[in-house]
Amino acid sequence: MSAPDDLIAGRYRLQELVGSGGMGAVWKAWDERLHRTVALKQLPLAPGLSPAEADLANQRAMREARITARLSHPYAVSVYDVVEHEGRPCIVMQFLPCVTLARVLQDVGTLQPVEAIKVGSQVAAALAVAHQAGITHRDVKPGNILVADDGTALISDFGISHALGDTTLTSTGLIHGTPAFISPEVARGGEATFASDVFSLGSTLYATLEGEPPFGREPNTIALLHKVASGVFPPPQRAGPVTFLLGQMLSTDPADRPSERLVSPGRLVSPGRRPPH
């Protein structure tokens, strides 16, 4: 168990625990080499892994973090370094005062369409650059979107759930991602793709507008996955001018979903009109 003033990898001095959850503990830390404040996330490994599996998950997490470190975008949390401490991977990232979008929704319930599209367009812009670099997020959801003090939204944790072996057991095998926000093809056991990231972003925007994800919050994971796999959900009632675009993002067929570049304030479309390609 880490504590304030611990030195990680001979370089990062822990100062304050700023968050914790299923995907690890996040510390405010001081980089003693570059003299700057950073965020250090200590990642957990999935329970029940054998030593060999734990080592593989550790290696995957380190690899995913190194890949993400190549991504530079104003709406993506920058990764500075990846180190190992007490057998667990630690990701050193940009530090900024923020809360997760999940916390925002917990506090305010829902967003107005103009607020939701601001969040969506910023995250989509970061995803577009990531996808151009061959990086799939695999777990877009409110908990992985940070909202800074100035209202800017940033996406974080690219590929981490996949790397750590954070999976859900289904009749077709193991799936990566958060069941309430994954795409139908992933719920059926398919691989996550750029198009499935678009669906997950659509699910996130739906939740910001309607107060819950498209397929609800069914506590039975298998039942929820069956709902997601069907692709059938209640039409949004509060999406206003983004209703049509949101419907396309949540298309069951990945080929019918728009690219990330269509998810922007300048590309909003009205119901009944097709967006430009």
Where are these regions (language model features)?
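Conserved catalytic-loop aspartate of Hanks-type protein kinases
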Residues: 197
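Protein kinase glycine-rich loop
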Residues: 14-22, 26
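Activation segment signature within eukaryotic-like protein kinase domains
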Residues: 119-120
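Protein kinase catalytic-loop region centered on the HRD/HxD motif
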Residues: 123-135
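AlphaC helix of the eukaryotic protein kinase fold
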Residues: 44-70
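Activation-segment/catalytic-loop signature of the eukaryotic protein kinase fold
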Residues: 82
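Conserved short submotifs of the Hanks-type protein kinase catalytic core
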Residues: 86-100, 104
